[in-house]
């Protein structure tokens, strides 16, 4: 089956919400170096619902069930589809809605809070907020 046939045959995804976990696909040859190279993988939507409602692109963080023994600085634990895993927060990317294959679940509020904290660190937002005297 070609990717185009597979792409056309997938169920229609209607409304996408922050915190939802989707199976999505990427072209294997798009990745270089240490970027994720798998054709299909899981990811959690982290773009805001206001953006998700109107846009056809979503900000997503890939999830993995590999190497769970150690959680690195920009990773956090997850539990999706009855499987333990982790969010690879430093691998954040934007994907088109057409890449989404199926919804598998939703992260808990606690899991999303952990992701938000790591995002603040990755983008140095704590320093920005301190400079603006917002924290």
Enumerate the language-model features and the residues they cover:
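C-terminal terminal-subdomain/extension
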Residues: 2-4, 79-135
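Short alpha-helix capping/helix-loop boundary micro-motifs
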Residues: 5-10
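Short, charged beta-turn/beta-strand-edge "cap" motif at the junction between a beta-strand
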Residues: 27-31
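Compact nucleic-acid interaction/catalytic patches
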Residues: 34-78
């Amino acid at each position: 089956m070609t990717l185009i046939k597979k792409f056309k045959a997938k169920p229609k995804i209607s409304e996408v919400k922050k915190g939802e976990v989707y199976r999505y696909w990427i072209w294997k040859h798009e990745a270089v170096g240490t970027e994720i190279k798998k054709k299909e993988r899981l990811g959690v939507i982290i773009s805001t619902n206001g953006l998700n409602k109107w846009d056809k692109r979503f900000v997503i963080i890939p999830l993995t069930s590999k190497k769970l023994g150690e959680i690195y600085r920009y990773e956090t634990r997850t539990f999706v589809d009855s499987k333990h895993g982790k969010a690879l927060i430093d691998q954040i990317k934007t994907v088109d809605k057409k890449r989404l294959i199926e919804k598998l679940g939703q992260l808990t509020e606690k899991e999303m809070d952990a992701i938000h904290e790591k995002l603040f660190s990755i983008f140095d937002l704590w320093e920005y907020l301190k400079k603006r005297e917002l924290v």
